[in-house]
A protein has these predicted regions:
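Secondary-structure boundary elements
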Residues: 15-18, 22-26, 101, 115-119, ...
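Gly/Pro-rich turn-and-neighbor structural signature
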Residues: 1-80
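Internal mixed beta-strand/loop scaffold within catalytic domains of large alpha/beta enzymes
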Residues: 46-126
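Long, contiguous internal "core" modules enriched in hydrophobic/ aromatic residues
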Residues: 120-173
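Solvent-exposed, non-transmembrane amphipathic alpha-helical segments
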Residues: 25, 29, 82, 112-116, ...
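Flexible, active-site-adjacent loop/turn segments at secondary-structure boundaries
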Residues: 34, 101, 129-131
Length: 173
């Protein structure tokens, strides 16, 4: 199961990278792909664009790390307090700053934490993520569409999610 989930995360990363590369039609942009390894286990890929026609700066990151014990900060109420058999955590994050001030900056991330059994199977897991836009020149129509699209997506999982998450967001910000 965990290998299939990692494939999905990796493919999401690659799809976003390809979409962003297609927005940069000239050779003006500096595109950098950096693959890295973590000594304790796992690694990831960081893709950045600097000084392009569309993006001033952006980053699309993938990571999948493994370890023997989760850091205390990761042991929230939704996870068992012991990860004696190890863990695996993975995620994709995107940060974009377009050149056009009428196109909002954006951020999104998806993440998955798994506590493992002795045989490597998933014992318990926690998933999360979020996304936001920061418009410099907000348009009411764009804001409404963004919220409507978020609601439509969340409604496919639970009709109460949008109201709950919007409330959490408004309290946080």
């Amino acid at each position: 199961m965990i290998n299939e989930l990692e494939k999905i995360f990796r493919q999401s990363h690659l799809d976003i990278v390809e979409s962003f590369k297609n927005l940069e039609s000239s050779n003006k942009a500096k595109l950098v792909l950096d693959k890295w390894k973590r000594p304790e286990g796992g690694g990831g890929t960081t893709f950045t664009i600097h000084g392009g026609n569309f993006f001033d700066n952006c980053a699309v990151n993938f990571s999948s790390i493994k370890g023997k014990r989760l850091p205390k900060a990761a042991l929230g109420n939704s996870l068992i307090k012991s990860s004696n058999n190890g863990y695996q955590a993975m995620g994709v994050s995107v940060i974009s700053h377009p050149k056009n001030p009428y196109v909002p900056s954006s951020h999104m991330n998806i993440r998955l934490f798994c506590i493992l059994e002795k045989n490597g199977d998933v014992k318990e897991w926690w998933a999360g993520g979020g996304y936001d836009l920061t418009p410099f020149f907000p348009y009411k129509e764009d804001c409404l569409q963004w919220h409507n699209d978020a609601k439509d997506l969340l409604d496919t999982y639970n009709k109460n999610f949008y109201k709950k998450f919007a409330k959490n967001c408004n309290e946080y910000f």
